[in-house]
Amino acid sequence: MKQVLPIHKVRKDVILGSRRFSNYWWASTIFIGALGFLLAGLSSYFQTDLLPFANSTELVFIPQGIVMTFYGSVGIFLSMFLWLTIIWNIGAGYNEFNKNEGIVKIFRLGFPGKNRQICLKFNIKEIKSIKIDIKEGLNPRREIYLCTKDKRNIPLTRVGQPLLLSEVEEQAAEIARFLDVVLEGA
């Protein structure tokens, strides 16, 4: 999502973090499945039905019950990790290109701690080009990079599902045109 202020000298692209539908889906699905495994394993240990729709007391605790308890515990921890990344909105932020101040600001949220907020600032004069990196195949990658004169490539696109090729090209061209720099492909 881009936002160009009326002065047309400031461009701000909002970056979606981990609060996407797919993350909510996987965190919920893993939690429900892991809870089922954990309750089935505990049912076999305590010989009490903790799952109302299944008879888990017939499971032998060693080896089936203990394995299900282990997988359930691991799944619960994985889902908690996913829920925490959603709550903390890891990866969210913005790219701000400000011609008035001559600064490019890249801001992202990280994990809690010393580096929770990551803010990179560059002088517009330090920017050499905007680069598009496209790799097709089983794990496609379509990314836009801000290339500086000291040969650093800073990613501008969000992490997750790749954007459509036309969207990547259009967004990169708009940024390059706004900054008056070269657009290059990889």
Curated annotation (Swiss-Prot):
Highest taxon of the source? Eukaryota
Coarse class of the primary localization is: plastid
> Looking at the keywords, is Transmembrane helix present?
yes
How does the entry describe its membrane topology? Multi-pass membrane protein
Q: Look up keyword Transmembrane helix and say if it applies.
A: yes
Q: Give me any GO biological process, just one.
A: photosynthesis
Note the InterPro entries from the entry. Answer: PSI_Ycf4_assembly
Location(s), subcellular: Plastid, Chloroplast thylakoid membrane
For this record, an example GO cellular component is:
photosystem I
Keyword list, A-Z? Chloroplast, Membrane, Photosynthesis, Plastid, Thylakoid, Transmembrane, Transmembrane helix
Give any Pfam family that matches: Ycf4
- Residue ranges spanning the membrane: these are 21-43, 66-88
Q: Which family does it belong to?
A: Belongs to the Ycf4 family.
Question: What role does this protein play?
Answer: Seems to be required for the assembly of the photosystem I complex.
What's the protein here called?
Answer: Photosystem I assembly protein Ycf4
Tell me the organism: Porphyra purpurea (Red seaweed)
| Underlying gene | ycf4
